[in-house]
């Protein structure tokens, strides 16, 4: 599990296209400092497994399904990516619960800078809008953010996030422009609540739940 607090801006050092897959070598001296083979590292919000390590670099394999469902398909040598190691048991939740399982992609629709922050509007698929609430959590390219506004309907839906200078400087969202595709992961708690609601008509009740 991750927290959505980016530890490092990494750089794609190499991309090798395979049969319905791709292999990326990523430069990231901070996240590789204590990494081991088989560890999980979130790359732009996608949980990936380390398959090889070199000093300051790690390699991950990305299957075709992940490439199709995320913006990782757009990455090339030189691309900057947000990196975060899996949270240790003794770590703090600086953001919110992030699984690294991308629910879909959005497209930056507008970037509106102001003196102290920048408002970014993201066009989002209609299938994800039911999970978006004002002041709720959303993960954008692996960054834990608070939804500041929600609008539109269906596939014309959008949400806005307000980015402080630290976020702009320390993540790749600082370079986002209209048309940039970003990975989105909605709050997992919202998905569990929906699932429980849909199953509320089931006759069975788990032991200990509602027992008297």
Residue map of PLM features:
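Conserved loop->alpha-helix
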Residues: 1-212
């Amino acid at each position: 599990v991750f927290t959505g607090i980016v530890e490092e801006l990494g750089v794609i050092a190499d991309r090798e296209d395979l049969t319905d897959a791709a292999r990326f070598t990523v430069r990231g001296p901070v996240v590789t400092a204590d990494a081991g083979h088989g560890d999980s590292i979130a790359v732009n919000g996608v949980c990936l497994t380390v398959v090889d390590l070199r000093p300051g670099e790690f390699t991950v394999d990305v299957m075709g399904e992940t490439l199709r469902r995320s913006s990782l398909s757009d990455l090339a040598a030189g691309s900057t990516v947000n990196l975060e190691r899996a949270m240790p048991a003794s770590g703090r939740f600086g953001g919110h619960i992030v699984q690294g399982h991308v629910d879909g992609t959005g497209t930056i629709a507008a970037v509106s800078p102001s003196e102290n922050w920048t408002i970014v509007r993201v066009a989002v698929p209609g299938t994800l809008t039911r999970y978006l609430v004002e002041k709720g959590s959303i993960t954008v390219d692996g960054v834990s953010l608070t939804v500041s506004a929600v609008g539109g309907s269906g596939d014309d839906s959008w949400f806005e996030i307000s980015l402080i200078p630290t976020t702009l400087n320390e993540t790749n969202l600082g370079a986002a422009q209209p048309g940039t595709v970003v990975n989105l992961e909605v709050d997992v708690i919202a998905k569990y609540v929906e699932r429980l609601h849909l199953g509320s008509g089931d006759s069975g009740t788990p032991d200990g739940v509602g027992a008297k």
